[in-house]
Design a protein with these regions (language model features):
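ATP-dependent carboxylate activation and anion-phosphoryl transfer catalytic cores
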Residues: 1, 6-10, 153, 268-352
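Active-site nucleotide/adenylate-binding loops and adjacent lid/helix of ATP-dependent enzymes
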Residues: 3-7, 11, 19, 90-97, ...
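Hydrophobic beta-strand scaffold residues
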Residues: 35, 127-128, 155, 179, ...
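Short, flexible, mixed-charge acidic loops at enzyme active sites
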Residues: 50-55, 119, 247-255, 311
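A glycine- and small-aliphatic-rich helix-loop capping segment at beta-alpha/alpha-beta transitions
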Residues: 119-128, 197, 202, 327-329
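Phosphate-binding site of ATP-dependent enzymes
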Residues: 196-277, 298-305
Length: 352
């Protein structure tokens, strides 16, 4: 198949996406597909051949890419674009996507995981992988997700609010501690703070203003961090995350050796079943499709507290879903190919 692996874009998770996309593209090419990596925002800038020739490029336009410890400089990315346009679709992106049999969406965060790209592809009749635009948009909104799933699964107490800089001190004064402060629509734990003091709450709220005016302030739950991938609507083995320092933030997620990841997780069968049930319930309630990954904190008594679900989980060398798939006997190349074939089937059957 001709496959465009769409990555990059203008999200704070740009670098993670490019790492995922590079690995996905190489895996699909190794399985005989004509796969090519395309940056959503920059498109085919710098490529001298005809757009349709990317599928025959010897390397699929895949360079060597690893995730830096620091978040990307998006201003520099914008400045590097030759036409200086803010259009999320770069040069020839829609053109080559329309030529493909399917687009593997390897985007993370805004302009990719939030449903906007999926909606555009639906309008243009371009087949793509993963959940549709509505489920993607809902899952990106942490507050809306929790409101929809709270009747069915256990989740930490939370409140969502929009605020200005002038309101930060008052909000900090009335916040129950300890708590977790996070942007309402970010991924990769970017902007997330565990706050134990009023000052830490205020600092976290100040930082979150860089990511939009809405935050979620969540009750801090002490427990073990477990995550569960899902493929074709069925949960994969749970994985436990044990950061060597701090919590599972951006740096700990994407730097090899920064966290211990144990899969299958060393937990009782009863815990595994509760996690499986909760993950599949959230997936079903939000009407997601093909694959995703849900995040939980499990307390000492075995209660799983649902945190959020990611419709386009990372596929980097340190990412969790590939590890969980491997524990279920599914290799990385097979996982990528199953996502493609399951997505095409789901769209044909009207399930995505």
């Amino acid at each position: 198949m001709r496959i465009v692996v769409l990555a990059g874009g203008l999200s704070m998770e740009r670098n993670v996406s490019l790492s995922s996309g590079t690995r996905i593209c190489r895996a699909l090419r190794a399985r005989g597909h004509q796969a090519a990596l395309v940056d959503l925002f920059l498109g085919l800038e710098g490529y001298d051949g005809a757009p349709e020739s990317i599928f025959d490029a010897p390397d699929g336009l895949c360079g060597d890419f690893s995730v830096a410890r620091e978040e990307p400089d998006l201003d520099a990315v914008r400045a590097s674009r030759r036409d200086k346009s803010e259009n999320i679709f770069g040069k020839d992106v829609l053109r080559v996507c329309a030529m493909a049999d399917v687009v593997f969406i390897a985007l993370h965060g805004a302009c990719g995981e939030d449903g906007r790209v999926q909606a555009a592809f639906d309008l243009l009749g371009i087949p793509y992988t993963g959940s549709g635009y509505l489920g993607s948009a809902i899952a990106m909104d942490k507050d809306l997700t929790k409101r929809l799933v709270a009747p069915y699964v256990t989740t930490a107490k939370w409140r969502a609010l929009k605020y200005t800089a002038d309101e930060i001190d008052a909000i900090a004064d009335e916040t129950e501690l300890p708590c977790v402060v996070k942007p309402n629509a970010n991924g990769s734990s970017i902007g997330v703070t565990i706050a134990h003091t009023r000052g830490e709450v205020a600092a976290a709220l100040t930082e979150c203003l860089h990511f939009g005016a809405q935050v979620v302030i969540e009750q801090y739950i002490h427990g073990r961090e477990l995550q569960v991938g899902i493929l074709d609507g069925k949960a994969l083995p749970a994985i436990e995350i044990i950061p060597k320092t701090g919590f599972y933030d951006y740096a700990n997620k994407y730097q090899a050796g920064a966290a211990e990841e144990v899969c299958p997780a060393p937990i009782p069968a009863e815990w595994e079943e509760k996690l499986r049930s909760a993950t599949e319930t959230v997936f079903r309630v939000l009407e997601l499709s093909v694959y995703s990954r849900a995040d939980f904190i499990v307390t000492e008594d075995g209660t799983p507290y649902f945190l959020e679900i990611n419709t386009l989980p990372g596929m980097t060398p340190t990412s969790l879903v590939p590890q969980e798939a491997a524990a279920a006997g599914i290799g990385y190349g097979e996982l990528c190919e199953r996502i493609v074939t399951s997505s095409l089937r789901a769209r044909k059957e009207g399930r995505a």
